[in-house]
Amino acid sequence: MPKISIRGTEMPASPIRKLAPLAEAAKQRGIQVFHLNIGQPDLPTPEVAFQAIRNIDRKILEYSPSQGYRSYREKLVGYYEKYHISLTADDIIVTSGGSEAVLFAFMACLNPGDEIIVPEPAYANYMAFAISAGAKIRTIATTIEEGFSLPKVEKFEELINERTRAILICNPNNPTGYLYTRREMNQIRDLVKKYDLFLFSDEVYREFIYTGSPYISACHLEGIEQNVVLIDSVSKRYSECGIRIGALITKNQEIREAVMKFCQARLSPPLIGQIAAEASLDADADYLRDTYDEYVERRKCLIDGLNRIPGVYSPIPMGAFYTVAKLPVDDSDKFCAWCLAEFDYERQTVFMAPASGFYTTPGAGRNEVRIAYVLKKEDLTRALTVLERALEAYPGRTE
């Protein structure tokens, strides 16, 4: 029998989804599972999106242009202008989710063997996309003790060599919820200029910043306009993960032309998804305001609750809707699997993402988990109770 490819063997399993079979088995046993593992918002999608879908009046559901509909891209120009990001419709390429934007950015900008510097912990799929592109992730450590702030510039420069081609950031950050400061963004800008690197900036959580600190986009950084590739998606801000609409944005025409070759090879981004996403830009201002307020309350509920559990510590996330928490366990992979396979409290259990999957450094994140606060406060409160009982019962507890 033929063997699968080396690429297929090296592709990492998702730390967010790899325990899903255990969760499904628990449900089959009648256990209620609180899903804290995945960034799937439970808040309603804007009604205008559903109205647009219901009002589709077409005889054919045709291919859309490979770059995405111009009407949608022109409307996005106005959206970004609200964040002081000046674009034209030609700067925007509509993609099948933010994930495709990351993959196409890698494919267009990196050669096999090229290296990308990424602060860790990092969104696990970045590693998968790098493998797909034949590139290599080089991680720079951030720690829970330091609130996941960036290390000094010298630590970055220790990693830079002749194969280094890019720095990748997620701001606000998934999985940590960290928000980069102006000083940190300027530090990254200076490195990009000094070593002539690409800067890939995943900014899908810009609506969710809780500190009062300003949102600093990579597109705000002067002097590196041709180096920046911005990644975006409607999945989180409008609870539209399933329509698979994202965007790759750059002022670099050479990058856009290369990306368009990959876009043409995959033919077109989703037609119906673009219709829904374009309509969502007309959602009432109260929609995003109410969504923001809800996440502020959920964040407080979760972080206060976690830090009341003996042996548990979580920093206060400044953005997105995740936190990385340290638990008093020997191994978070084992603990998360145990919660689903061997534990329940009053017929309930919790599904969390082991943080080790967000690191490439061996042993890092071994006693950490990522938790998404995408459940209503009543469910979060109950999930915290279940987690506390699980930690009390877990055989591998360390404190």
Locate predicted features:
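Conserved N-terminal alpha-helix of the aminotransferase class I/II PLP-enzyme fold
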Residues: Y63-S96
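PLP-dependent class I/II
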Residues: P2-I4, G8-S14, L19-I56, S86-E399
